[in-house]
Amino acid sequence: KCGVSIPYKISPSTDCSSVK
C-alpha cells in the first residue's frame, strides 16, 4: 500500500515506487 510503513523492506518507509 502507498503511504504505509513496509516491514518486509530494509527501511520501514512509505516506498510508493516499490509498492506500485
Curated annotation (Swiss-Prot):
Keywords per UniProt: Allergen, Lipid-binding, Transport
Protein's name in the database: Non-specific lipid-transfer protein
Keyword set includes Secreted: no
Source species, domain of life: Eukaryota
Tissue-level expression: Leaf.
Function noted in UniProt: Plant non-specific lipid-transfer proteins transfer phospholipids as well as galactolipids across membranes. May play a role in wax or cutin deposition in the cell walls of expanding epidermal cells and certain secretory tissues.
UniProt record similarity statement: Belongs to the plant LTP family.
UniProt source species: Cannabis sativa
A GO term for molecular function: lipid binding
